Amino acid sequence: MKKFTKLKGIAALFADINIDTDAIIPKQFLKTIEREGLGKNLFYDQRYEKDYEEKPEFILNIEPWKKAKIIIAGDNFGCGSSREHAPWALLDFGIECIISTSFADIFYNNSVKNGLLPITLKKDDINVLTDLAFKKEILTINLKEDLISVRDINISFNIDKIVKNRLINGYDDIELTLKNESLIEQYEKNKDKFFDWKYIE
């Protein structure tokens, strides 16, 4: 998994609340287990008329937000059904960070497991970033310092230490397991000491 330390890019604004996973990647695109190519189907119903004809008013069809790396979203982003394709599609499009006041738990966990950084901020900080996004300002996100910077504006954020370590080092589930392989082996060798086993013949 790609390591996440620092990100610099423009932010696209999705102000609606409760943007669900079906809006992010509709169900007809869930048949594949391939991650590449899903980006073109991101926000399909809002982004296209038919046959991938772009709706000119949609934010990701407008320069410079066509190249957005960050989304500033309304409350409860990623709600709805569980589908790992949602972070896959966002990442394949080029989105590497979502900033919101809140996330659906399953979407949050799926994002972290795939290297997509979800940042939770207070509403006042979201409002500041929203104004900057309208002005097409470049945001810098420094995960090591838990800091979002735009010119002379600095906004700090809190993130779970385990999540932070995982993203900075690019650990997926398998890599996390292998990292603790010696501890797992030690446990397996000594687990009989921890439990009062009764064997029945």
Can you describe what each PLM-predicted range is?
Residues M1-G74, G78-S81, H85-D105, N109-N110, ...:
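Cytosolic catalytic domains that perform sulfur/thiol-centered chemistry
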